[in-house]
């Protein structure tokens, strides 16, 4: 990689095959073009992936056509997922639009990675995305975990049938303006998604209202938040590795819908590791537990410590309690938050 817009500390081997997500917008178009210019043998080693959710009618179709033209011009293979009846699925699954779209998108990416024998996925998250993620997590009340930003390389865990997806984010230190300037310098057009301006979405509120307001006190707030996220993401990764070694003493037992471990061994763990292990366990039982609040984690700690009688519903369809010397967390399948 020789382009200065790529500024990362970790990356897959340059011999690897990669799936590159492209929506047609500025960020992903810039990423794909950078990969074409910098990745060895891109026509053989890169496969572009586009999802057409069909939510914006003719605009969605125009996005797909624009992506097809770019990939044909740059001689990059393209795989497209056309989502049928997205709104019907949304109603049936009772999920938010963003969660449903994310689930469909990453499931598609995972299938492509497996089919193409690829290392994983490259996505176009940039410096502002990092800052917004850190601030969003902090505002949701996730505590110190909220300061942990996006990782350059991360392994996402899904269901048993599609367990993992490696994700590379090579643009985390690159600004949005730099990507726009890069495309303009090469006379490359991109698509604009009008929904990115709608303040009905939480992320857009943070981008267009909260960050600009807070930046009145620190004009470099976006950069500060992004760097904080980068540092804490590395520390978070170290803590996860340390946690795995410590948790081996718990003699934990997993089933598809439950986890249990020795209560006395759990109580010997440092409180910081206890909270982290509860979050890890809850998220493994249900992906929706990513939204588990500090108070809900504390509730599980009280139940597991015998300071509160159980079993009790602790949110997201999970219940916690004690059975003899064992403490447990179960997924009842009821999707409450």
Question: Where on the chain are the PLM-derived regions?
Answer:
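Histidine kinase transmitter module recognition
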Residues: 38, 70, 213, 217, ...
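AMP-forming adenylation/ATP pyrophosphatase catalytic core
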Residues: 2-27, 43-51, 83, 104-105, ...
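A structural signal for well-ordered alpha-helical scaffolds and beta->alpha junctions
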Residues: 60, 64, 106, 175-176, ...
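ATP-dependent adenylation/nucleotidyltransferase module used to activate substrates
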Residues: 1-137, 158-160, 177, 266, ...
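Catalytic subdomain that performs nucleotidyl-dependent activation
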Residues: 115, 120-124, 129-228, 232, ...
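Short, solvent-exposed polar/charged micro-motifs at secondary-structure junctions
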Residues: 88-93, 202-203, 234, 322-324
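Surface-exposed charge patches
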Residues: 69, 111, 180-181, 212, ...
């Amino acid at each position: 990689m020789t382009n200065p817009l790529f500024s990362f500390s970790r990356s897959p081997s340059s011999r690897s095959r990669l799936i590159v997500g492209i929506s047609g917008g500025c960020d992903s178009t810039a990423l794909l073009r950078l990969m074409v210019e910098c990745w060895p043998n891109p026509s053989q080693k890169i496969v572009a992936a586009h999802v057409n959710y069909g939510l914006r009618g003719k605009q969605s179709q125009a996005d797909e056509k624009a992506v097809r033209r770019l990939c044909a011009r740059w001689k990059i293979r393209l795989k497209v997922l056309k989502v049928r009846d997205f709104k019907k699925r949304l109603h049936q699954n009772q999920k938010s639009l963003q969660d449903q779209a994310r689930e469909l998108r990453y499931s598609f990416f995972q299938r492509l990675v497996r089919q193409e024998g690829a290392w994983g996925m490259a996505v176009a998250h940039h410096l502002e995305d990092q800052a917004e993620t850190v601030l969003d997590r902090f505002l949701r009340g996730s505590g110190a975990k909220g300061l942990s930003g996006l990782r350059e390389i991360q392994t996402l865990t899904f269901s048993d049938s599609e367990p993992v997806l490696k994700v590379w984010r090579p643009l985390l230190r690159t600004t949005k303006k730099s990507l726009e300037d890069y495309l303009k310098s090469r006379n490359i057009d991109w698509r604009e998604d009008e929904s990115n301006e709608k303040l009905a979405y939480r992320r857009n509120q943070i981008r267009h209202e909260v960050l600009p307001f807070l930046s009145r006190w620190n004009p470099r707030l976006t950069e500060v938040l992004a760097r904080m996220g980068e540092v804490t993401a590395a520390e978070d990764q170290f803590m996860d590795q340390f946690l795995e070694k410590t948790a081996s003493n718990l003699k934990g037992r997993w089933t598809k819908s439950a986890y249990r471990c020795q209560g006395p061994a759990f109580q010997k763990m440092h409180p910081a590791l206890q909270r982290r292990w509860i979050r890890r366990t809850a998220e493994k039982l249900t992906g929706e537990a990513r939204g588990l609040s500090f108070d809900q984690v504390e509730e599980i700690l009280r139940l597991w410590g015998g300071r509160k009688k159980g079993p009790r519903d602790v949110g997201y369809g999970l219940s916690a309690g004690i059975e003899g010397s064992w403490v447990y967390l179960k997924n009842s399948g009821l999707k409450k938050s």
